[in-house]
Amino acid sequence: TVGSYWVYDWYTVDSAGNSTWDPNQTDSVYIAGDTIIGTDTFAIQVGTWFGGAFSPPFRNYLRNLNGDLVTPSGSIIFSATNYTDTFYIWNPGNGQTMGYRKMIDIGEIVTVPVGTFRTLNAAFIVVNLVGTWSCFGIYDIHDNQYAENIGMVRTSFQFIGSCQALEGRLRTYYIAP
């Protein structure tokens, strides 16, 4: 809904699970409006990623299609109902890695600064096709955990050469009526 927003704080999590808040990395995401693409209405989502450190503010176009969050190209980035299919496959063509999006960890309880939620994880999983990574084995899992009627409450990613993960945790949000 136009006017809804979410604010995330970022944490560094070491291999033992200890987390450290980074006060210099905060993101906000909001619904700026909607637009028609083809014959479908999409929400315009605007925000920053990791405090803008990796990219300028982004603009996504998303819509709800029978419980799935989809892009204008039809890619599913989240599903509230389909826990078996692979939604997206990424292949850079280098023969070393590939990735895919899949719903995992259904019903996992997640605690973030704003509260505790039962979540669905629209994980992006990168697979090492030629060996293992020192900290992850063959799978590098990037979490995108969503709570019903809230949106994304936790996201995580890591760099291949590091045993630390970076986590965005929901600090506050507002869902416009």
Where are these regions (language model features)?
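Conserved functional acidic sites
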Residues: 1-177
